[in-house]
Swiss-Prot record:
HAMAP family: AIRS (MF_00741). One of its GO terms (biological process) is adenine biosynthetic process. The keyword Cell inner membrane does not apply. One of its GO terms (cellular component) is cytosol. This is Phosphoribosylformylglycinamidine cyclo-ligase. GO terms for molecular function: ATP binding; phosphoribosylamine-glycine ligase activity; phosphoribosylformylglycinamidine cyclo-ligase activity. The lineage of its organism: Bacteria, Pseudomonadati, Pseudomonadota, Alphaproteobacteria, Hyphomicrobiales. Pathway: Purine metabolism; IMP biosynthesis via de novo pathway; 5-amino-1-(5-phospho-D-ribosyl)imidazole from N(2)-formyl-N(1)-(5-phospho-D-ribosyl)glycinamide: step 2/2. Belongs to the AIR synthase family. SUPFAM superfamilies: PurM C-terminal domain-like, PurM N-terminal domain-like. CDD domains: PurM. It is an enzyme of class 6 (ligase).
Length: 355
């Protein structure tokens, strides 16, 4: 039998009591995400969801998982942790809604070298806010304290979301064809991809995170770059329901890879998309990044959303109805281009990006 001075888990760097205290602290946040089908209680071995109570009769489940990349490093270095969870939810639920599905529930994974009081709860504050924006329940998660694997209080996040659509309602439809029109929905800024390049540019600029943001008066550089990813779930679901099957033919979440890599994911082999860059209202952050980093336009287009976080492919005869439904839901759609026969590249560009 080990003596009184034998090793303990706490001595090895894992504080079970701190983990339990965090779970208790976040329970009210989790409960705030309750919705039909989920009571949003945590602490059991698994989370439960009742599809019938959510109103589905013949559903297809849609699952997605993602992270926030090195944007999390800015949260760590600035000490601001209460919005990065919104990004985490957004990256998952936006990938679900583009398939015509309603996000239903979310789970998170928070891994760190050392649990710091208040940090985990701040992260979950953002996750709960993201879930409320998306209308999905936070039904579980994992907090992993792993000394030696992460440096000090560094952490990483992963999210997992599941949604559902009635059979026959999934997107894209098989009817995407030349002549269809392409709408764009504005982004809030950089969103959650390209941050390894963002951080390299900031380092080259010599500006600290608390310096005034050159592109956002009244905000610090770190605060401006931590602007949360937009969650498009509610306006898109509202537009899909208001306009009926066939009006919206496809949706594309513009993340890493930009327009060139994400648009072909929802297109049939024989068609492409022609985009008018003059139609894009580019947020000032992208101009600053391009100028400060000397980043060429093709690299900007393949790394960042450049001001458009979601693309909507619409039947031309229904374009006014879709635009009206999106505006009624609080969106500001812009006409970006058209679906064309596929040329040399699946995505072609005209006009000039206003960097």
């Amino acid at each position: 039998m080990a003596g009184e001075n034998g090793l303990t888990y706490a001595a090895a760097g894992v504080d079970i009591d701190a983990g339990n205290a965090m779970v208790e602290a976040i329970k009210p946040l989790v409960r705030s995400t309750r919705r039909p089908g989920a009571d949003a209680e945590i602490g059991g071995f698994g989370g439960l969801f009742d599809l019938k109570a959510a109103g589905f009769s013949d559903p297809i489940l849609v699952a997605a998982n993602d992270g926030v990349g090195t944007k999390v490093k800015i949260a760590i270095e600035t000490g601001r942790h209460d919005t990065i969870g919104i990004d985490l939810v957004a990256m998952c639920v936006n990938d679900i809604v583009v398939q015509g599905a309603e996000p239903l529930f979310f789970l998170d994974y928070y891994a760190t070298g050392k649990l710091v009081p208040g940090v985990g709860a701040a992260i979950v504050t953002g996750i709960a806010e993201g879930c409320r924006q998306a209308g999905c329940a936070l039904i579980g998660g994992e907090t992993a304290e792993m000394p030696g694997l992460y440096d000090g209080s560094d952490y990483d996040l992963a999210g997992f979301a599941v949604g559902a659509a009635e059979r026959g309602a999934l997107l894209p439809t098989d009817g995407v064809a030349p002549g269809d029109l392409v709408l764009g929905l504005p982004s809030s800024g950089v969103h959650s991809n390209g941050f390894s390049l963002v951080r390299r540019i900031v380092s080259a600029s010599g500006l600290p995170w608390d310096a005034p943001a050159p592109f956002a008066p009244g905000r610090s550089l770190g605060e401006a770059l931590l602007t949360p990813t937009r969650i498009y779930v509610r306006p898109l679901l509202a537009a899909l329901r208001a306009t009926g099957r066939g009006a919206i033919k496809a949706l594309a979440h513009i993340t890493g890879g930009g327009f060139p890599d994400n648009l072909p994911r929802v297109l049939p082999e024989a068609v492409g998309i022609a985009l008018d860059l003059d139609a894009v209202a580019v947020p000032p952050v992208f101009g600053w990044l391009a100028r400060t980093g000397g980043v060429a336009v093709p690299e900007m287009l393949r790394t960042f959303n450049c001001g458009i976080g979601m693309v909507v492919v619409v039947a031309p005869e229904r374009i006014e109805a879709v635009e009206a439904a999106l505006r009624a839901a609080g969106e500001a759609p812009v006409r970006l281009g058209t679906v064309t026969p596929r040329g040399e590249a699946p995505v072609s560009f005209a006009g000039r990006l206003g960097l």
